[in-house]
Amino acid sequence: MAYTLQAILGRSEVLYGASLQGTKLVPLLSGVSMLPLGRAFLEACGAPFLPLTDAGETSLPSTIREICAQLAEGGDVAYVEAEFSGGEGIQASVLFHRGGVHDPPRLATNAINIALQALGVNPPAGSDEFSAVGLGAHRDTEQWLSSAGA
């Protein structure tokens, strides 16, 4: 079964009140919230779908980078991507700190877990950060937006 995600993650208090055209704040578990970056958002800002994992880019599009940097003025945020199908796939993450890029893009099967660790997520024994915040609840970005009423 396929899984795709393109989103901005952050502590709930950091992302609280964030408003981006075409998306809606989705509370997750462990004090984390998410701004899913679906089709409407990508079209509105002219950004590509999964630029790091699908398009093979080595840096974020400027529109997404600027939005993340602005959000990170209030605390750390992470831009994340995931693309899996049939047990094969990759994740990407970019951590933003104090209004700028903290780490270069990371492509790895656990890139989202590493970003969530940096955001302060401590999973219980036998779990990982991805599961601890509930990112497995939906299989793609548009489902997250539908569940949030966007």
Regions found by a protein language model. Name each.
Residues 1-29, 149:
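Short, extreme N-terminal segment that most often corresponds to the first beta-strand
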Residues 32-150:
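Charged interaction segments
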